[in-house]
Amino acid sequence: MPKTDIARRVYNHTWKLDPIVRSLLDTDFYKLLMLQMIWQLYPDVDATFSLINRTKTVRLADEIDEQELRDQLDHARGLRFTKKEMIWLAGNSFYGRTQIFSPEFLAWLARFRLPEYELSRRDGQFELTFRGRWAETTMWEIPALAIINELRSRAAMKGLGPFTLDVLYARAKAKMWSKVEQLREHPNLRISDFGTRRRHSFLWQRWCVEALKEGIGSSFTGSSNVLLAMDNDLEAVGTNAHELPMVAAALTRNDRELAAAPYKVLQDWNQLYGGNLLIVLPDAFGTAAFLRDAPDWVADWTGFRPDSAPPIEGGEKIIAWWKKMGRDPREKLLIFSDGLDVDTIIRTYCHFEGRVRMSFGWGTNLTNDFAGCAPTEINGLNPISIVCKVSEANGRPAVKLSDNPRKATGDPAEVERYLKFFGSEDFVEQSVRV
């Protein structure tokens, strides 16, 4: 692939619209895996997704031009999966499996387009909402976040000249490469790119992926970004996300169904997938509650992804649970992915080395770390904690608790009800930077 002069490309914005999302494959792989399950098992469920900016000090509607945002969202709505992309999805192997996507699902996907959106401004923030069938609205999460983050980056750099931009990206590349050199010192460490949602830009994410591929070779196990995986001959990586138990819980009619919801979606998942895709995400309503009530068969799954507890603390709890359930942790897999940077990755790897198999999903601190790179400080280049979460399912409020109370989402009264039901054991409040 020819190399792009990112600084020159950023400066040369002379066209009417420079699309941020140019392909529906510019999304995370787990969205496609979940989409097939939703399409097959929940075709009539409505789900509303809402933008949430957890960094309240950043007034997005003051930094990003609303018309530019609308133009980018409208462009994304005009995209379809191309013939080349459909052939790749049908013929490629994922996690050692061919034809992981059924012909019927792919036929539906070939006609897919993103549904309409609702956009307004309130108190310096955008209110961005997607309503409709779950199998349609779910696909807005990643492109919406990528669009907002890149528009914010563009706005922050708008006044910079070509020389300053060149310095900015040269420093960012040097900073990134120094992280690669640290990772090289641990050749058995396995790491993948999880940085699509809050990336600085698509071109920058592509450069980071190329740097990891060049710099650490086989230790780089792939990218969650499907388009980058296809274009760079990498593994597309990812399993499932919080929206599955969130929607399942919102649809329940009584306490018995609510208690069973986190495990029901795992059984649904197991109908379609197996092997290395059997990864448990335990923290939607608190990891302690999940482990306390988990059926024995959960311990037979390949691994866990502890996503909101401190990585060492969260990993230790899961290892202790495996031992309690009579399983050997050395045969299991832990995937760490929450707010990691190279120091945290190496520290966690060294702590657990030899005790459990590990993989690391490196996100925002891979694809959006420009701190100290600009000649003068530019606040708009600092990453923010922004998410697009399911807020309703069939008109009922959806809730996420997580192991970090600051990451909880949902109607406050409903959050309180879930806390009383599941408990808040072992919750640890931590600042949320990304």
Swiss-Prot record:
Modified residues annotated as Phosphohistidine in this record: 242
Gene Ontology BP, a term: NAD biosynthetic process via the salvage pathway
Enzyme Commission number(s) of this protein: 6.3.4.21
Sorted UniProt keywords: Ligase, Phosphoprotein, Pyridine nucleotide biosynthesis
Reactions listed under catalytic activity: nicotinate + 5-phospho-alpha-D-ribose 1-diphosphate + ATP + H2O = nicotinate beta-D-ribonucleotide + ADP + phosphate + diphosphate
Pathway: Cofactor biosynthesis; NAD(+) biosynthesis; nicotinate D-ribonucleotide from nicotinate: step 1/1
Pfam family, one: NAPRTase_N
Class in the EC hierarchy, top level: ligase
Record keyword Ligase present: yes
PTM statement from Swiss-Prot or TrEMBL: Transiently phosphorylated on a His residue during the reaction cycle. Phosphorylation strongly increases the affinity for substrates and increases the rate of nicotinate D-ribonucleotide production. Dephosphorylation regenerates the low-affinity form of the enzyme, leading to product release.
A cellular component annotation (GO) from this entry: cytosol
Family per similarity comment: Belongs to the NAPRTase family.
Biological role: Catalyzes the synthesis of beta-nicotinate D-ribonucleotide from nicotinate and 5-phospho-D-ribose 1-phosphate at the expense of ATP.
Name of the protein in question: Nicotinate phosphoribosyltransferase
